[in-house]
């Protein structure tokens, strides 16, 4: 067995790994064609079939090290075995998928070829047969084609082609089942004998623990001869291709100049000079094709980006056109399969529970938009699924009274007819066989029942308290997505409409996926090729060579020196704005990764990043503790900061989502919130040359000059800008139990202080009662409660209400000075009196991994691309 001591200079010179930290490796000799073999140990013997105890090395058995050429494939299968929860779960899953696919083929073939639908419609059975004097019908004779292929029409040819195509696909999956079974058994051996983890333990063991065991195994069995393995290296290998797709979306490269009404079109992220809006698009079908054309084709067998791929955009454009043309030819067969699949999966559910069609789920675009760098699949699903309830609650903040009124009337009328039919059924069941207008009463009962269920689902709940800001903050706790254009406008229809493009009705999303089968070929042939140059330039600019890993997206490598943003706590600031990630996604991804893998030790810049956040957190905690220690100041600020009452504990374990433990900075403080957006909004107050200081000086002078000026306006402006963004960017449900709930500065909109999940609705915690408006008195909710003299939504008027569409980079990198100068200018441009208002669900084909082909082996020269 090769020990770790064998890793010497000769080995390093043989592999010639290069680390491109300061610049893209694609511009510094990226494509070296040396063979990069990774050494991996053999597996020990499998334990006895009935035993769950992992076996060790018996009878002097030794584990020899043998090199493997594809460490990416090893990490991928290691994770797949963990995600699918062991050997028997994998076997059962594959068997069920094969049976399901076979059933779809047989089911659709029988009903599309053998069933005579015209004969079935004209067949007379039951009372109809008796009344017509015919013999009782025989469905086999009446509705079954004895010769299904006669006559052989164009429709029949399409159906036969569909059956033949998917039959071949089923046979391919069947053979692949046995081919993968051997690899699955090998990885079971590896888990049992090398990691000492059984299938039962996998069910409850965190993924980070599995990686820790692999890292520990490296020291004794030399899994990688180039360098010591780390959790970061293995996850970068696992998500090598996915990180590029996440980066492309983050930089807006998958936005196309299409109309908003095209199925699958997401939010607009930028506008052209001529007014054309670019909408993000990533349907499931488009994702598959981009995966085939770009992600699976860009790497060679050494996990390096192929030089000819990035230097020849014409080849990629041709490939996109050919794939689009092939999809256009296959689209009739794909549509048939999708229709049959969706019918079998959802028809019974929609029939018995029609309201299911009006439920919502995140679109495929939103999932990739929310996903972070190096975030593995099961952790992301847990996070995104936790946001569904809160996203639904947010959309309920925008009631539709007219629709509810009409739906109540329709439900009342249809429910009345359904009730009459129920009474008839109780009196005499045979009466239901009677006919009215050619239909029996059973048919009417089904129709009225369905109409009643759908209309009742359209009736919106009557919310006693509308709090779009607070509800949006709960959404962002899990999605970590809060565009700057949303802040301060949570109660606007524009934000609601944009969220609805990401959080769609289930029925509408299924229809869009079917329509995307025809739209994707058009995009591939005529739209996507126009962005090929930008996509390849992104790959050039954001690819680095990591020793022992290969080429990866530089965002996933957490290079603060090249891509850092000091507004999000980075110790370095990228010289060019284009090098930074949008909305601080790299910084958020780093914090998430550090919390998910606590045993991983980052570099010095990463530690400095965490230190910056700790310092910021401690300073804010000290400020709030000082504020609360003064009774007079606490009382004065409580009138201006209703959100401070949110620090009351509210059953922190009730939600059942404990993912916030992943967002720890200090392991001893398990109630730590997510600080990055709070840090971002607070940087405006910490700059010595920031215009807000000039505004504060003016405010102070005016405060001393007049008694009518609100004495806490300066404090209100600073704290109000912090609250909403800190609250809306916390990483998860534990924000409700966080110790930093005491440190909630007033948000951009200080309204919405009542917690959405708080059953208590005390009047003293509802709004800001510091200023009394005699010009706009509010209605009193109850005679025992003080009147609300302030419009809680007037806060939004202090912001720019124009809905501007900008590019992602421009939106997130806009300087905070503009906001503060504008606020100060507006406050100083008017005479302020005491009576003035002064506030502010996826469709996956079976064996979807069949598209994950191994990197293409190419022989490229060691030359630079530029």
UniProtKB/Swiss-Prot annotation:
Lineage of the organism: Eukaryota, Viridiplantae, Streptophyta, Embryophyta, Tracheophyta
Domain remark in the UniProt entry: Forms a homotrimer with a solvated central pore, which is connected laterally to the cytosol through the cavity within each protomer. Acts as a lipid scramblase that uses its central pore to function: the central pore opens laterally to accommodate lipid headgroups, thereby enabling lipid flipping and redistribution of lipids added to the outer leaflet of ATG9-containing vesicles, thereby enabling growth into autophagosomes.
Chief location bin: membrane
PANTHER family: APG9 AUTOPHAGY 9, AUTOPHAGY-RELATED PROTEIN 9
Protein name: Autophagy-related protein 9
Subunit structure: Homotrimer; forms a homotrimer with a central pore that forms a path between the two membrane leaflets.
Gene field: ATG9
GO-annotated biological processes: autophagy; defense response to fungus; lipid transport
Role summary: Phospholipid scramblase involved in autophagy by mediating autophagosomal membrane expansion. Cycles between the preautophagosomal structure/phagophore assembly site (PAS) and the cytoplasmic vesicle pool and supplies membrane for the growing autophagosome. Lipid scramblase activity plays a key role in preautophagosomal structure/phagophore assembly by distributing the phospholipids that arrive through ATG2 from the cytoplasmic to the luminal leaflet of the bilayer, thereby driving autophagosomal membrane expansion. In addition to autophagy, also plays a role in necrotic cell death.
UniProt-annotated stretches for the region Disordered: 744-781
Annotated knockout phenotype: Mutant plants are hypersensitive to nitrogen or carbon starvation and show early bolting senescence.
Positions in the Lumenal compartment: 116-153, 426-433
């Amino acid at each position: 067995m090769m020990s770790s001591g064998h890793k010497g200079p000769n080995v390093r010179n043989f592999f010639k790994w290069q680390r491109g930290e300061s610049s893209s490796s694609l511009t510094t000799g990226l494509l070296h064609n040396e063979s990069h073999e990774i050494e991996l140990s053999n597996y020990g013997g499998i334990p006895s079939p009935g035993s769950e105890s992992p076996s060790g090395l018996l009878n002097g058995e030794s584990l020899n090290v043998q090199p493997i050429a594809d460490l990416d494939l090893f990490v991928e299968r290691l994770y797949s075995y963990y995600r699918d929860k062991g050997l028997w779960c994998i076997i059962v899953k594959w068997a069920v998928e094969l049976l399901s696919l076979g059933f779809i083929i047989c089911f659709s073939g029988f009903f599309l070829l053998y069933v005579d639908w015209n004969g079935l419609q004209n067949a007379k059975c039951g009372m109809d047969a008796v009344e017509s004097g015919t013999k009782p019908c025989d469905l086999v004779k009446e509705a079954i084609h004895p010769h299904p292929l006669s006559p052989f029409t164009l429709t029949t040819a399409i159906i036969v082609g569909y059956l033949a195509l998917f039959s071949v696909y089923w046979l391919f999956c069947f053979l692949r089942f046995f081919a993968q079974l051997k690899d699955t058994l090998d990885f079971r051996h590896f888990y049992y004998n090398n990691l000492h983890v059984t299938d039962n333990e996998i069910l409850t063991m965190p993924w980070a623990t599995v990686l820790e065991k692999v890292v520990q195994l490296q020291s004794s069995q030399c899994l990688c001869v180039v360098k010591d393995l780390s959790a970061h290296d293995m996850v970068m290998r696992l998500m090598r291709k996915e990180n590029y797709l996440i980066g492309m979306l983050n930089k807006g490269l998958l936005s196309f100049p299409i109309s908003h009404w095209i199925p699958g079109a997401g939010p607009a992220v930028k506008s052209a000079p001529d007014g054309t809006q670019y909408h993000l698009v990533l349907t499931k079908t488009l994702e598959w094709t981009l995966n085939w054309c770009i992600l699976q084709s860009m790497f060679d067998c050494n996990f390096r980006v192929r030089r000819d791929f990035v230097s020849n955009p014409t080849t990629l454009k041709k490939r996109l056109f050919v794939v689009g043309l092939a999809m256009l030819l296959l689209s009739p067969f794909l549509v048939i399969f999708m229709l049959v699949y969706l019918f079998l999966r959802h028809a019974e559910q929609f029939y018995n529970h029609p309201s299911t069609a009006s439920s919502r789920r995140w679109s495929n675009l939103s999932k990739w938009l929310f996903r972070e760098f190096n975030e593995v699949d099961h952790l992301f699903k847990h996070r995104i699924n936790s946001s569904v309830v809160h996203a639904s609650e947010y959309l309920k903040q925008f009631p539709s009274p007219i629709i509810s009124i009409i739906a109540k009337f329709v439900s009342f009328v249809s429910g009345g007819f359904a009730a009459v039919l129920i009474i008839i059924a109780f009196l005499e069941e045979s009466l239901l066989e009677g006919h009215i207008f050619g239909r029996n009463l059973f048919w009417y009962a089904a129709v009225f029942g369905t109409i009643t269920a759908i209309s009742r689902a359209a009736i919106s709940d009557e919310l006693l308290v509308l709090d779009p800001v607070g509800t949006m903050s709960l959404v962002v706790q899990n999605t970590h997505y809060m565009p700057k254009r949303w802040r301060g406008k949570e109660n606007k229809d524009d934000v609601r409409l944009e969220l609805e493009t990401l959080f769609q009705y289930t029925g509408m999303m299924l229809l869009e996926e079917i329509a995307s089968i025809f739209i994707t070929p058009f995009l591939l042939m005529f739209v996507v090729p126009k962005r090929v140059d930008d996509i390849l330039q992104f790959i050039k600019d954001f690819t680095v060579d990591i020793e022992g890993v290969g080429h990866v997206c530089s965002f996933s490598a957490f290079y603060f020196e090249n891509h850092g943003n000091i507004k999000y706590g980075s110790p370095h600031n990228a010289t060019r704005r284009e090098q930074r990630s949008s909305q601080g996604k790299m910084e958020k991804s780093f914090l998430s990764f550090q919390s998910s893998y606590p045993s991983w030790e980052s570099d010095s810049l990463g530690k400095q990043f965490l230190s910056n956040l700790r310092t910021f957190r401690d300073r804010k905690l000290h400020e709030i503790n000082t504020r609360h220690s003064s009774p007079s100041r606490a009382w004065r600020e409580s009138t201006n900061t209703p959100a401070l009452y949110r620090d009351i504990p509210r059953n922190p374990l009730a939600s059942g989502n404990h993912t916030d433990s992943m967002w720890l900075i200090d392991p001893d403080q398990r109630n730590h919130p997510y600080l990055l957006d709070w840090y971002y909004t607070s940087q405006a107050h910490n700059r010595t040359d920031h215009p807000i200081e000039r505004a504060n000086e003016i405010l102070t002078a005016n405060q001393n000059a007049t008694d009518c000026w609100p004495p806490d306006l300066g404090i209100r402006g600073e704290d109000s800008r912090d609250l909403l963004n800190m609250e809306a960017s916390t990483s998860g449900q534990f924000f409700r139990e966080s110790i930093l709930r005491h440190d909630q500065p007033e948000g951009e909109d200080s309204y919405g202080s009542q917690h959405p999940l708080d059953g208590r609705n005390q009047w003293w915690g509802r709004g800001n009662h510091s200023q009394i408006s005699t010009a706009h008195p509010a209605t009193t909710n109850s005679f025992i409660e003080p009147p609300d003299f302030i419009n809680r939504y007037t806060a939004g008027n202090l912001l720019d209400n124009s809905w501007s569409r900008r590019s992602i980079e421009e939106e997130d990198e806009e300087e905070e000075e503009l906001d503060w100068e504008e606020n100060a200018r507006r406050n100083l441009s008017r005479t302020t009196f005491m009576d003035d208002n002064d506030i502010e669900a996826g469709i996956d084909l079976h064996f979807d991994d069949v598209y994950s082909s191994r990197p293409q082996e190419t022989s490229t020269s060691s030359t630079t691309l530029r």
